[in-house]
Design a protein with these regions (language model features):
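Non-heme di-metal
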Residues: 2-382
Length: 382
């Protein structure tokens, strides 16, 4: 048991964090990264640190000229997707730290969320970098984001689960049910269950956001890159996509741990919320399909149209469902990628670029091979 009754920035009690649940355990004390309950979160932290990059490393000199050659339909596709991605990363640039970290009770997940939020901030800076280099007046994009009805309509479903959890958590924190004398009362048990249920929904929402909602925009950016247009922007989006894959994996492991032995109450909630999660997926796919129609209302890009994008969204959603132990419910089978050419953009190893020309996406910072044996270099001669 901990003597801490409430929240603290530094817990002076001795707590074995290898035996704690991911959330709602005792407050954290010493940040130590030598032993873990869930080593995968430290691995994901190391990956993100190794992938660290800055948007200024990618040249956008050609993109400004390319943008001027686009027709009206293509400019609509490019600009609308930028606006939507700015919305998503504005949410994720503060969401994990604002909503999840205050209730995190293992250091490896806390550290993972710290770098997660930092990388999302870099994504937001990247959109500013693109806009400042491509558009003569950046305000034409930024100032119109909150005037776009299509963007605002999607913002509500993207942020609702976050906001619901934040409001429930605030009410719980300002009440008395978390105090030692009240914790075991029926009302307190209901309140903590409701709090955990809202956390589950918020994390599921983030998994869908990171794993599905970005991908229509990604595919459009890569389609321009395939046509040798706006290649600098496409490379930046490729770097962002690589990061988002890591962030999706964080939320995926949180959800899967709850289905196992992390927290018995969360395991029950996961079972009870299964149909709700399916409905969240259905809503996201429906909204992304409508977004694809809106993007291509004036015309398509060579190699890409709204119908192909809609199949791609379904294919992606089925993959995400399977990764959290749920069944595929959409028509496009996992075995048939409708946009196979996107694969090399989403895989940093598939990007073949000259180092002097652009950012090398497969380059890792601080990556060291530690399993070298005494005979590893036996075949080498000087």
């Amino acid at each position: 048991m901990t003597s801490v009754d409430g929240m603290t920035v530094f817990n002076t009690d001795q707590v074995d964090t290898t035996k704690q649940t991911m959330f709602f355990g005792p407050p954290l004390g010493v940040q130590r990264y030598d032993k873990f309950r869930y080593p995968i979160f430290d691995k994901l932290t190391q990956n993100q640190l190794g992938f660290f990059w800055r948007p200024e490393e990618v040249s956008l000199q050609k993109d400004r000229a390319d943008y001027q050659t686009l027709n009206k339909a293509q400019k609509h596709i490019f600009t609308s997707n930028l606006k939507y991605q700015i919305l998503l990363d504005s949410v994720q640039g503060r969401g994990p730290g604002m909503a999840f970290m205050p209730y995190c009770s293992i250091p490896e997940l806390e550290g993972c969320m710290n770098i997660w939020q930092t990388m999302e901030m870099i994504h937001s800076r990247s959109y500013t970098h693109i806009i400042k280099n491509v558009y003569s007046d950046p305000s034409e994009v930024f100032d119109k984001i909150l005037e776009d009805d299509k963007i605002l309509a999607r913002a509500q479903s993207v942020t609702k689960a976050y906001d619901d959890f934040l409001n429930v958590a605030q009410e719980y924190g300002t009440g008395n049910m978390w105090r030692d004398g009240w914790k075991e009362s029926p009302t307190a048990r209901w309140e903590i269950n409701n709090l955990k249920r809202n956390l589950y929904r918020a994390v599921a929402n983030v998994y869908i956001l990171e794993g599905i909602r970005f991908y229509v925009s990604f595919a459009c950016s890569f389609a321009f890159g395939e046509l040798k247009l706006l290649e600098g922007s496409a490379k930046i989006i490729g770097l962002i996509a690589r990061d988002e894959s890591q962030h999706m994996t964080v939320s995926q492991h949180i959800l899967n741990n709850w289905k196992k032995d992390d927290d018995p109450e969360m395991k029950e909630i996961a079972m009870e919320e299964e149909e709700n999660v399916y409905n969240m997926f259905r809503q996201a796919v429906d909204e992304e399909n409508l977004w694809a129609e809106y993007l291509f209302k004036d015309g398509s890009i060579i190699g890409l149209n709204d119908k192909l994008l809609q199949k791609y969204v379904e294919w992606t959603a089925n993959k995400r469902l399977k990764s959290i132990g749920l069944k595929a419910i959409f028509d496009t089978p996992i075995s048939n990628n409708p946009l196979p050419w996107t694969a090399h953009w989403l895989s940093s190893k598939g990007m073949q670029v000259a180092p002097q020309e652009t950012e090398v996406e497969s380059y890792l910072i601080g990556s060291i091979k530690q399993d070298v044996k005494k005979d590893t270099f036996a075949g080498f001669q000087l």
